[in-house]
């Protein structure tokens, strides 16, 4: 279903991952996140063979087909607090695939994970709580385990931040959104999606015990970061 949620000129409520968003989410994220399919392919490649993967904030489980195409043996647990997202994710069936409804702030019970993924999820959690979560997730991994974080980040330099925002809006217009839709969604996300700098995440990964930290994906204000314990 095509995303037309923000066409209305009426006052928009704050953004939430409800049924209306779930219904159009796959279209929305592919039009709003640059190179999203390629990004999922990169994440799947980083997972590696024989992995036990926890996908935190898994939404509709879009990573699963990429894992299936690449690996014959893996275990996957997807967790999301949106019931409608979890219900839609159930389409990705498999004996080694499990989806759970749960709030990351209530804690996650891990069972020997080798890879933990936070794909565009920490940005929806208050910045004051993110470092503690990263510490917890890194602590749950064995030596050599991977924490993969993908975020929409902000720049320290305000002029550069505005230049990147302009480029991002150009991308969304090229993908069929009107400027009015873009503005309406920005308003709905204000205070809901709060970006931090890439330095913030790299510092948090280092403090949590990552021995190797690298950026594997970057497009203006979107970054994929890898921490290896």
What is each stretch, according to the model?
Residues 153-206:
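C-terminal alpha-helical "lid/dimerization" subdomain adjacent to the S-adenosyl-L-methionine
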Residues 117:
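A conserved beta-strand element that flanks and buttresses the S-adenosyl-L-methionine
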Residues 214-229:
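Core SAM-dependent methyltransferase catalytic element
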């Amino acid at each position: 279903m095509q995303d037309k949620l923000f066409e209305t000129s009426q006052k928009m409520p704050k953004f939430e991952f409800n049924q209306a968003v779930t219904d159009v989410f796959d279209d929305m994220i592919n039009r709003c996140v640059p190179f999203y399919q390629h990004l999922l392919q990169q994440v799947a490649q980083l997972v590696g063979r024989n992995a036990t993967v926890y996908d935190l904030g898994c939404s509709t489980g879009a990573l699963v087909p990429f894992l299936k195409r690449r690996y014959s043996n893996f275990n996957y647990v997807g967790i999301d607090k949106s019931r409608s997202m979890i219900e839609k994710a159930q389409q990705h069936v498999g004996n080694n695939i499990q989806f759970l409804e749960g709030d990351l702030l209530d804690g996650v019970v891990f069972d020997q994970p080798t890879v933990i993924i936070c794909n565009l999820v920490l940005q929806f959690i208050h910045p004051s709580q993110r470092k503690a979560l990263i510490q917890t997730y890194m602590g749950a991994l064995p030596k050599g385990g991977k924490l993969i974080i993908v975020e929409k980040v902000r720049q320290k330099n305000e002029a550069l931040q505005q230049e990147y925002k302009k480029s991002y809006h150009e991308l969304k217009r090229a993908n069929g959104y009107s400027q009015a839709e873009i503005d309406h969604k920005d308003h709905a996300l204000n205070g809901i999606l709060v970006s931090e700098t890439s330095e913030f995440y790299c510092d948090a990964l280092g403090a949590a015990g990552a021995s190797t930290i690298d950026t594997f994906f970057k497009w203006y204000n979107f970054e994929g970061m890898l921490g290896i314990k």
